[in-house]
A protein has these predicted regions:
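A membrane-interface helix-boundary motif in multi-pass transporters
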Residues: 55-77, 270-288
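Glycine-rich segments within core transmembrane alpha-helices of 12-TM secondary carriers
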Residues: 33-53, 256-264
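C-terminal ends and interior cores of transmembrane alpha-helices
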Residues: 196-209
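C-terminal membrane-cytosol helix-exit motif in multi-pass small-molecule transporters
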Residues: 53-54, 76-100, 294-299
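Helix-to-loop junctions at the C-terminal end of transmembrane segments
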Residues: 57, 172-186, 272
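Juxtamembrane intracellular "pre-TM" segments in multi-pass secondary transporters
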Residues: 91-128
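Cytoplasmic helix-loop-helix junction between adjacent transmembrane helices
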Residues: 4-41
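A late C-terminal transmembrane helix in Major Facilitator Superfamily
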Residues: 244-275
Length: 303
């Protein structure tokens, strides 16, 4: 189980990198919009995936396997299909074409070198901070909301609806977010995303566990704010690093993002266990607010 989960995690990490591949050949005027369409494509899987649980389980039982094997079979099949499609049709490699090279030898750097380069680059550092902090706020509140609602016996169908609305906010409006990022600028859309995240934590933090409507609004805004920080932050990162550090910096950003998410999920459990869901939401708002304040300094220096 541990090995399988590790391999699925590696596949997920590769999938996240697809958004960067989409902008290797993009112009400055359309970079965020093109990235956002890749993120928007996740909406299909996010909506269809949970609905395949039942038929996948039935299929597994029909071929003599445990019911819980079914979702893994579906996941393995779709991942294999994705790999085949990319291998056959993503030619020539957009990264190689963008750098007018047939090899990566002249354009690679290690993750450690990339992190060092980012640390010396305030704009790139802000971009990764926006991605990571948006992710940690989203994950920490999102994973504990079903637990919070279940404590007062809210039905699973209602909880599922709230999470579905959250996923809608995360992915469905990605093209709009990308277009705004191209028109208004990356930093401004990140600021908008941070403001939405702050609003969502306040709405969710003051909501009663039984108030599915208010929690749904809060979780929708949580997803939308995350979308803004991810899309605008990813575009800003790609633009702010040197070509030789671009690929490794993009990988480093996802490493930091997912470590932040894992930390947020772990800490969220401790906070809700010792304090309350409301305090969890307010705690998630703190790094968001601090980054929002620092963003105005960055924006003023870049003008």
């Amino acid at each position: 189980m541990l090995t399988g989960t590790f391999l699925f995690g590696a596949a997920s990490a590769a999938g996240y990198q697809a958004r960067f591949a989409a902008i290797d050949l993009a112009t400055d005027e359309k970079r965020a919009k093109q990235l956002s369409f890749v993120v928007w494509g996740s909406t299909i899987g996010a909506v269809a995936g949970p609905n395949l649980m039942q038929p996948a389980g039935n299929f597994a039982e029909n071929i003599g396997l445990p019911r819980l094997v079914g979702p893994y079979l579906i996941s393995a099949t779709t991942l294999a299909l994705a790999a085949v499609v990319i291998a056959l049709f993503l030619k020539p490699d957009p990264y190689l074409l963008a750098n007018k090279s047939n090899s990566l030898d002249a354009n690679t750097s290690s993750t450690r070198e990339a992190l060092s380069h980012i640390y010396r680059n305030p704009t790139a550092l802000f971009a990764i901070a926006a991605i990571a902090i948006g992710h940690i706020a989203m994950v920490s509140v999102m994973v504990m909301t079903p637990v919070h609602m279940a404590h007062v016996d809210v039905t699973l169908s209602v909880i599922g609806l709230v999470i579905s609305v959250h996923v809608l906010g995360m992915y469905a409006f990605s093209p709009i977010v990308g277009s705004l990022s191209d028109r208004l600028g990356r930093v401004r859309v990140i600021q908008i995303g941070l403001a939405i995240l702050l609003l969502s934590t306040l709405i969710s933090g003051f909501a009663q566990a039984s108030d599915a409507y208010t929690l749904g609004v809060g979780l929708f805004l949580l997803g939308l704010g995350w979308s803004c920080t991810l899309i605008a932050g990813s575009a800003l990162l790609s633009e702010s690093v040197e070509t030789s550090f671009k690929a490794s910096s993009q990988g480093a950003s996802d490493l930091v993002m997912n470590l932040a998410g894992a930390t947020g999920g772990a800490v969220a459990g401790v906070i809700i266990g010792t304090l309350s869901y409301g305090w969890l939401c307010f705690a998630a708002a703190v790094p968001v607010a601090l980054l929002a304040i620092s963003s105005f300094k960055l924006k003023s220096e870049s003008l």
